Amino acid sequence: MRSDRIKKGFERAPHRSLLRATGLNDGDFEKPFIGIANSHIDIIPGHYYLQEYGRIAKDEIRKAGGVPFEFNTIGVDDGIAMGHEGMKYSLPSRELIADSIETVMNAHQLDALVCIPNCDKIVPGMLMGALRVNVPTVFVSGGPMKAGHLHDGTPIDLNTAFEAVGKRAQGQLTDAELYEIECQACPSGGSCSGMFTANSMNVLCEAMGVALPGNGTVLALTPEREALVRRAARRAVEIAADERFKLRNIANRDAIHNAMVVDMAMGGSSNTVLHMLAISREAGAPLSLRDIEEIAGKVSHIAKIAPSLATVHMEDIHRAGGVPAVLREAARRGGIVREGALTVTGETVGERIRDARTADPELIRPLENAYSPVGGLAVLFGNLAIEGAVVKTAGIQPSMRRFTGAAICFDSQDEAIAGIMGGKVKPGHFVVIRYEGPKGGPGMQEMLSPTSLIMGMGLGESVALVTDGRFSGATRGACVGHVSPEAAEGGVIGLVQDGDRITIDVEARALTVDVSDAELARRRAGFRPKRRDPGSSWLRRYAHLVTNAANGAVLRSTDL
């Protein structure tokens, strides 16, 4: 066992002495040492109860013949960090989480790992760190929260609350109506109830085979979710000494492909593209945006969940058959699902989905009745996004799939929010928010506040938005993000001027600004990208090392 390096031989007597101080005895030194990477934090609704799941996991590991060692990672709640400088820390936290997993696991030479994440950047951060360590690993998330309901039974979620702010600003909601939404949108613990970033990533972990069936859709704080935690912990002990289940053997190129198939079939958060680019690099099987667009062109969009369809939430998809049913339906298009991929349970993907059934064909549609013959995410290219940009097509109104508008430019999210609230944005505008990329922000803030304002103010079918920042999984509308190169590295988005005509064409996979090459060259001659002092040692280091969105916003190591 790997842990023999800290517990075997006379020269490890000091190490054993320290371990005995934690409660270990002679018999424990013959057992596998299992790490539990928890992400309990009180301020995040999807994480405040994870301490109990960690306790359950430790109990099960002991019963199964292992020795558990629980440690914690940090976490950021993107919803609470939204719309202020705190959002600059969200994406960078992914790297800190990955580094912390690598540090604890390798410093102590633990044999296997149970990861208990749930929200936002915590899932990909744990997966990236675990891939570096490459020991047998099982993921089990905290689970999605229930949908909320208004007094008349209308289902709502966190996105309802964000969009309600725009409606209140327009006088379309009273303070009492806004208060009801505020109090009912998030009725329980768990990751926010739609196909937002957290649930998208937990679904993708299930599709990759690094988590047990049900991981993406079983509700938080239920007996069924607790049973998943118990099974995951036991499984980690069972596979601790089995080389076949090293994480890179599970999360390989086929598994990553399957994750992107489910992502396209369910119209996941656009953040998944950013994270899967980064995860694939840690797995040694790097994806490119071109690879992702190729997958998108072959996968039908068969399930719509909030925010794309406001009445459907993760609990509904679970009742309809969950991720196995989505994969099984997608697999009817021969060869699109890599059914031979091994999962952490020891089954192949094909075996896992063989008996899956769709209980509601309106929630998980057959291929013949798909929402679209292509995936719910798309990668766009053009002179405004030479290296690519990402759009969640699942959330775009049909009338906005091809749209040309006059640019109205803002050099920060704060400026954009003030401009939208102040009435500067009119029908026919193409809002440009720049200097919000990984380097420029720094931290690549999510633009949920401005996009929710646009929707809430009734501009969703007459205004589009483009940014080198990113979006919450709750964003809907004609919103294009991840523009690369970003403004801070000299991208064309930094050269756009008010009034320039910008076109998004989803079918053509194009994002262009109607300005000649000669004029762009003239503008570039006098262009100096803006530089912000983030006022933070960590963010300053991050801005120096981070790559652009087309490369997953991973940190470069060549300068170190």
From Swiss-Prot:
What the entry lists under Pfam families is as follows:
ILV_EDD_C, ILVD_EDD_N
What domain of life?
Bacteria
How would you classify this enzyme at the top EC level?
lyase
Provide the E.C. number(s) assigned to this enzyme: 4.2.1.9
Record has Magnesium as a keyword: yes
Instruction: Show the disulfide pairing.
Output: none
Q: What's the protein here called? A: Dihydroxy-acid dehydratase
The record lists the lineage as:
Bacteria, Pseudomonadati, Myxococcota, Myxococcia, Myxococcales
Give the gene that encodes this protein.
Answer: ilvD
